[in-house]
């Protein structure tokens, strides 16, 4: 169940440097501790390992996510444009997604992120379509790409 279900994710993170794995797992705990009733959706994609939290089991309802790349982690908000970034710390100029680059705990403005998470979660709940069966507190592996580009592999 949920936060304790970490085996698949740890396996997906094996090719990444220790500091990147540590940041990803610390950020994961950070979100799980704040939103234990949500679901973690994991994607072992071609370019990166990504996982996010959703009040449902649907990717469209994800309110925050972590993307693990070669030398850092992106911690972001799928609809980050929908709420204010008072401190102007979020990166991104697309139509929806905003994020922080995180390399260490010291890089991460945890108290400010808690405010952003609250807004992102409320936004996701407000946009959520009715579901027949509500799934809560689960870790769900949504996809595993058969071919991956990871640190240390030939491009």
Where in the sequence are the language-model features?
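Charge-dense, helix-prone N-terminal extensions
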Residues: 1-155
């Amino acid at each position: 169940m949920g936060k304790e279900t970490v085996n698949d994710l740890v396996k997906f993170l094996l090719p990444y440097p220790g500091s990147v794995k540590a940041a990803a797992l610390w950020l994961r705990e950070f979100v799980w501790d704040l939103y234990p009733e949500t679901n973690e959706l994991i994607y072992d994609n071609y370019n990166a390992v990504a996982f996010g939290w959703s009040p449902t089991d649907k990717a469209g309802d994800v309110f925050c996510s972590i993307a693990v790349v070669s030398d850092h982690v992106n911690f972001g908000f799928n609809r980050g444009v929908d709420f204010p970034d008072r401190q102007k710390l979020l990166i991104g100029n697309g139509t929806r997604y905003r994020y922080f680059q995180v390399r260490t705990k010291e890089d991460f403005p945890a108290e400010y992120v808690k405010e952003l998470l609250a807004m992102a979660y409320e936004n996701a709940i407000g946009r959520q379509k009715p579901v027949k069966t509500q799934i809560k507190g689960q870790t769900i592996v949504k996809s595993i790409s058969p071919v991956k580009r990871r640190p240390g592999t030939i491009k």
